[in-house]
Amino acid sequence: MTQEADPNALRILYVEDNADIRDMVVELIESADRRVVVCTDAETAWQQLQQATFDVLVTDVSLPGRSGTELARRWLAGDASRRVILFSGYDFKSELASLGTNVRAIPKEDFNELERALVEIRQHLDLCASRRC
C-alpha cells in the first residue's frame, strides 16, 4: 500500500490464489481508509488471522489446500459475529446458511456488490463503536 493508512482503517484479509484477479481486486478495494493484507492460500491466511486483527475476511472459495469456506468456518468458530465475504465464481449458497448470518456470498464478477458490502461493514463497525456494542 502506498498511502499512509488511517489508524481506524477497515482491516481486510483478502485470500485469492489467482494473481490477475487478486491484483485487480486489491487495486479496487484498497484505499487510505482500508488496509488490505493479501494471502494466496488458506493456511497462510489462518496464520495471519492468528497474528493480527481483521474486521473482515474476503476469500475465494476454491483455494489450494483448505477451501475458503473451511477457512471462514474456522475463523467464525472463534467469534460468530465476525464478518466474512465469500467472493467466488463458484455456487456455494448451499454452504452459506451453515456459516452464519455475518457471511455474504458475492459473485467474483460483481465488484460493485463487493464495494457495497465493504461500505456496509464499515458503517456497521462505526455504529457499533459509537454504541459500544
Walk through the language-model features, giving the residues of each:
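Non-catalytic signal-transmission and effector/linker regions of two-component phosphorelay proteins
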Residues: 1-13, 104, 110-133
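Two-component/phosphorelay signaling modules centered on CheY-like receiver
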Residues: 18-37
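Acidic, metal-coordinating helix/loop segments flanking the phosphotransfer/catalytic sites
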Residues: 38-56, 116
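Acidic catalytic/metal-coordinating carboxylates
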Residues: 41, 67-70
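Active-site residues of response regulator receiver
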Residues: 60
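The feature encodes the CheY-like receiver
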Residues: 64
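Short amphipathic alpha-helix used as the core "switch/output" element in two-component signaling
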Residues: 69-81
